[in-house]
Amino acid sequence: MRPGSNVIKAFNVIGMLCALVFGAPAMAIGIDDLSSKDAASGLKEALTKGAEVAVGQLGKPNGFLGDARVKIPLPESAQSVEKMMRTFGMKKQADELIETMNRAAEMAVVEAKPILTNAVKSMSFDDARGILAGGDDAATQYFKRTTSEAIGAKFLPIVKKSTAKVDLAGKYNKYAGKAAQFGLMDKKDADLDSYVTQKAMDGLFLMIAEQEKAIRKDPIGTGSNLLKKVFGAIGK
């Protein structure tokens, strides 16, 4: 196989899907056994797998804590306090709080899977067309738009249950709330549970975006049977 041929084929797959979804005649692209419905279904398969991979990566032990891209630190406005804690012999407590935050995110993120899957199932033909024709993060933006509220509602109680086990988390909320009243801390960072919930969502969508980029770069790598069907057809 010539160098770069897989990359060329990958772009051809995306081009073919766009042609199918936009209604180009099948014979015009050399395939007469695929329909626009097949193309949209193939996209849904790929996005479902991508979402599952993202959730799986983050939901495993150290999915957040062990990955610098998504690890949740203390809020920026509280990091000076963290530095003081570490300086004055409270390193263990600071580490415990940060670990608790990230473990909470790891437990919560698995709840996103059915919500993301349902968003894919509910995707309209126009949504699919927009994703195929959109930018590198068009699918990620679709997920954000359609799932953020539901995911946040699922994450928050799980995060609260986890942080409630750590005394320092309660103290953080107490003193950070007062600091926010006096303008010494950003209000969005004053509630640790809400902060962790948002950061967990940010991490999830970051990983989904990376999966989307991988799908666009190498559709065949998703394992979608319909995309394999297209790939095989253009590879003959």
Predicted regions and their residues:
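Residue-level signature of catalytic and energy-coupling elements of molecular machines
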Residues: 54, 124, 219
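An amphipathic alpha-helical core segment
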Residues: 158-204
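A cross-kingdom marker for long, charged
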Residues: 203-236
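Short N-proximal segments of mature Sec-exported proteins
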Residues: 40, 44-55, 138-141, 148-156, ...
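Bacterial N-terminal signal peptides that target proteins for export
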Residues: 2-15
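N-terminal signal peptide c-region/cleavage motif recognized by signal peptidases
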Residues: 23-25
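N-terminal Sec/ER secretory leader and immediately downstream segment
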Residues: 29-100
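Mid-length scaffold segments of soluble, non-membrane domains
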Residues: 91-162
